A protein has these predicted regions:
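Polar low-complexity intrinsically disordered regions
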Residues: 1, 31, 110, 198, ...
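Long, non-membrane, amphipathic alpha-helices that form coiled-coils
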Residues: 1-12
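Catalytic core segments in nucleotide and nucleic-acid processing enzymes
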Residues: 10-171
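Beta-strand/loop-dominated core regions that host nucleotide or nucleotide-derived cofactor-binding catalytic loops
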Residues: 174-265
């Protein structure tokens, strides 16, 4: 997995210099970093029949089958949905139906991470993933999750539930609640105008700005709407929030999230 100029150049290096030699090993180590404690390499297990998935996650129900693929271009339908073909055989072999899957694709592996397509999966693949009940993730997503997990002190239960979702899995932790987008930036006063689309924002909340690689978290110390101080900015409002973001960071279209507290989850 190639990163941007500020990042290491391979996936094996990005996840805290793990020193592993294969993509599967790097993914396995990344999963352990976010708190999974029972990640098994299928090649090391005794199993009947032909080779199946690369990894298995046995931390809780359902068991997750993880298929890892590295490809030079964009993933084909076969590449992306292969893990779905392993579900029924494993259910039969293990005599249980609580088996899910995750397909982790290192697409455009020779391209720097920041230059890769953010939409590598076709509509057909996305539909199949939902219908067959497995998740789709890129190694760039996984890298971003691990990097921010380490930098921002996220907890395992902020990230692990993502792997049990079906369809496209974004690099957005579960304790982030979508607010809206940056629409304006007032450089002289250090204020961003956030168009609130979903979750309301209150003074005293913590919010996160999604940059190309990292998230920047901060407290909402002051909040304005229609040029006056308010306690809450609801959907539809252009909320003015004091920020430490630079002009380069506070670009139009940057996604903003409200950080849910433990008590409100």
């Amino acid at each position: 997995l190639a990163g941007g100029s500020a990042c290491p150049t391979s996936f094996r290096d990005t996840v805290h210099d793990f020193g592993r030699t294969t993509l599967v090993e790097a993914v396995k180590r990344a999963l352990s970093v976010v708190g999974f404690t029972s990640v098994l390499d299928s090649d090391e297990l005794v199993s009947t029949g032909r080779r199946k998935e690369d990894l298995q996650i046995h931390d809780c129900s359902p068991v997750l089958l993880v298929e890892v693929k590295g490809i030079a271009g964009m993933p084909t339908e076969h590449d992306a949905i292969q893990v779905g073909k392993y579900l029924a055989p494993r259910m039969k072999e293990w005599g249980r139906t609580d088996v899910g899957g995750v397909s982790i694709i290192n697409h455009q592996r020779n391209v720097p991470g920041l230059d890769r397509s953010l939409s590598p999966f076709t509509d057909v693949v996305l539909t199949n993933a939902i219908d067959q009940q497995f998740g789709l993730m890129t190694t760039w997503d996984l890298f971003r999750l691990v990097r921010n997990f380490l930098q921002l002190g996220w907890k395992p239960d902020d990230v692990q539930p993502l792997f049990y979702r079906h369809g496209r899995m974004e690099a957005v932790p579960v304790h982030y609640e979508y607010v809206g987008l940056i629409e304006k930036y007032f450089e002289k006063v250090g204020v961003v105008g956030i168009r609130v689309v979903e979750a309301a924002v209150q003074q005293g909340d913590r919010i996160a700005y999604e940059l190309p690689i990292d998230y920047i978290e901060q407290e909402v110390e002051s909040l304005q709407a229609e040029r006056r101080a308010v306690a809450t900015a609801a959907a539809g409002v252009l909320a003015g929030v004091k920020t430490n973001l630079t002009k380069e960071q506070a670009r139009t279209g940057v996604r903003v999230f409200r950080i849910k507290t433990r008590a409100t989850r």
